[in-house]
């Protein structure tokens, strides 16, 4: 679906309906609970797509790419491959610290990760919006 508030609203309704019927949600949510996002926010991710020469001409654009927003749901038969948490926004990078907005099995959290956190900091440096992240909150 398009990564718009309306696209997310429709997916959220479908999510609630499928979960009520016993479906197993695999992604992007790391849990089967109700979505913890407030009604004025929406879960969306970004994918960079290459533009053809014709596409650039039609759009009057100079950049050879376009950042497309989307939202999605993935269901499966078992929860064995479900992420522990998911990065919801682009990480905020500061000197010696990275702040992540995560959806975890226990809800939404803002996680500051410092250099002294070792392997967690290394994972945070590589993290992008939409990635699974190895943190149980």
Predicted regions and their residues:
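Short, solvent-exposed loop/turn segments at secondary-structure junctions
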Residues: 5, 32, 79-81
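C-terminal lobe and adjacent flexible extensions of AdoMet/dcAdoMet transferase-like proteins
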Residues: 45-137
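Conserved beta-strand signature within the Rossmann-like core of class I S-adenosyl-L-methionine
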Residues: 1-6, 24-28
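Conserved catalytic loop of SAM-dependent methyltransferase domains
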Residues: 30-43
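Conserved S-adenosyl-L-methionine
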Residues: 23-33, 51-57
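A short acidic (Asp/Glu
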Residues: 7-12, 37-39
